[in-house]
Regions:
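Conserved SAM-binding motif I beta-strand of class I
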Residues: 165-170
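Class I S-adenosyl-L-methionine
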Residues: 1-159
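S-adenosyl-L-methionine
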Residues: 158, 177-231
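Extended alpha-helical scaffolding regions
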Residues: 233-238
Length: 238
């Protein structure tokens, strides 16, 4: 077992035993999302702490730091799926995502978005795209995490300017938060919302709804310019 996972489970072993595990897990995901989002959602954290008492902050923060270490150790692993399985609130994902397969899916997605038939030409033209995963129930966002790693590996110099990753919608409880938390820790532009994305005219999810948790990179100067350009383009159409 991973050292980071041992540490996270040690903190979890002190969680209130009289509370349902699934409720504790949902609140941990909400607390972690509010910790990693920009700006930090302190009001939500205060409400969660008030539900259990002050000790819960120490336990959640300890587990959160452990998963952060896990992402730093190997960003390709789905840290929250590992933790959910060991905590007993999820089953091992039946879906296995080979890096090659995800790479092919990403290239095809870029070719579709850029309307280029040549993969190399399409990748060179790929800027300002969004990747949306509506249903995270089956794999806790493993496919999105794998695709984010493909983006980081293919575009090492400017991977934060290639794609926004969006999870949420389709009534998938709190599992939509899992890929967001990991990708935000990885430094990727991303957001998560139970309401799903706001789609522009070209089906790009550049804008986040009010209910969204957003990573710091979502508000970078690059993506702010992209959104302004999209607003200008939409206004011209009116």
């Amino acid at each position: 077992m991973y050292i980071w996972l041992d540490r996270a489970l040690e903190y979890f072993s002190y969680l209130p035993r009289n509370e349902p595990k699934l409720q504790l897990w949902h609140d941990f995901l909400l607390w972690s999302a509010s910790q990693v989002c920009e700006p930090l959602n302190r009001d939500l954290q205060i409400r969660i702490i008030a539900r259990y008492g002050g000790d819960i902050r120490t336990l959640f923060m300890g587990a959160y730091r452990a998963i952060t270490a896990g992402v730093a150790e190997d960003p390709a692993q789905n840290v929250l799926l590992h933790l959910a399985v060991e905590f007993g609130v999820a089953c091992p994902s039946p879906a296995q995502y080979a890096g090659e397969t995800i790479d092919q899916l990403f290239v095809q997605r870029v070719m579709d978005l850029t309307d280029k038939s040549d993969p190399d030409v399409a990748l060179a033209a790929a800027d300002g795209i969004t990747i949306h995963l509506a249903n995270c129930d089956k794999d806790y966002g493993s496919s999105m995490i794998a695709m984010a790693n493909v983006v980081r590996n293919r575009f090492r110099a400017n991977y934060q300017e290639k794609a926004i990753f969006v999870s949420g919608g389709d009534g998938n409880e709190y599992s939509y938060l899992a890929p967001f938390i990991q990708l935000a820790i990885m430094g990727m532009p991303c957001y998560a919302s139970p309401d799903g994305p706001i789609l522009c005219g070209d089906q790009q999810a550049l804008f986040a709804p009010q209910s969204a948790f957003c990573s710091a990179e979502f508000f970078s100067s690059y993506w702010t310019k992209v959104r302004r350009a999209e607003l200008w383009r939409m206004n011209r159409r009116m």
